[in-house]
A protein has these predicted regions:
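N-terminal secretory/targeting leader peptides
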Residues: 2-174
Length: 174
């Protein structure tokens, strides 16, 4: 990635992540990304694969590396006052419904990811899956990005989100 102009959001963590990977972080608007890749204003991007398919980025970007670094969440939120007003039985029902929702959404999300990746692979010149040794280098950039961005996020919130994703080892390295 050395020297490549890599599209980032304005997230300080993503900016440092791309910089740690050796590319030149280039904050660039999502709605302009297709044209940016097409014209060479940006030469790469770090976007979850199904969104790349939805935005048809595979039409202008032909090389893909699968690093498993993107996560998308599907959440349910409720006002604490309303939640606290529920009876124990109502909370039990709510938790059961939320668990069922979570399972179904994960199932649908996984199918969406697979469909998007399959469509991209059909037109990509290359879909590369790094070796475990190569993944260690990708992960090192991520750890450095989080450390470099300290002070720009709430540590306890970040820790909880990462732990909920099963990233205990990653959190331990931070």
């Amino acid at each position: 990635m050395k020297g490549l102009k890599w599209r980032t959001t304005k997230s300080p963590v993503e900016f440092m992540l791309v910089k740690n990977w050796g590319a030149t972080p280039t904050p660039y608007d999502w709605s302009q990304l297709y044209q940016g890749l097409q014209s060479g204003v940006v030469e790469g991007q770090y976007v979850a694969s199904p969104w790349q398919h939805v935005a048809k980025l595979h039409e202008v970007a032909k090389y893909f590396t699968e690093i498993g670094g993107m996560w998308s969440g599907n959440i349910l939120a409720m006002d604490a006052k309303q939640y606290n007003a529920l009876s124990d039985q109502q909370r039990k029902w709510l938790h059961q419904a939320a668990d069922a929702y979570g399972e179904k959404v994960n199932e649908l999300d996984n199918a969406w990811i697979k469909n998007g990746e399959d469509a991209i692979k059909a037109s990509a010149k290359e879909w590369y899956v790094p070796t475990e040794a190569e993944m260690t280098k990708w992960r090192a950039g991520a750890i450095g990005a989080w450390l470099d961005a300290k002070g720009t996020f709430e540590p306890e919130v970040a820790k909880r989100v990462l732990m909920e994703q099963g990233m205990d080892g990653f959190v331990a390295q931070l």
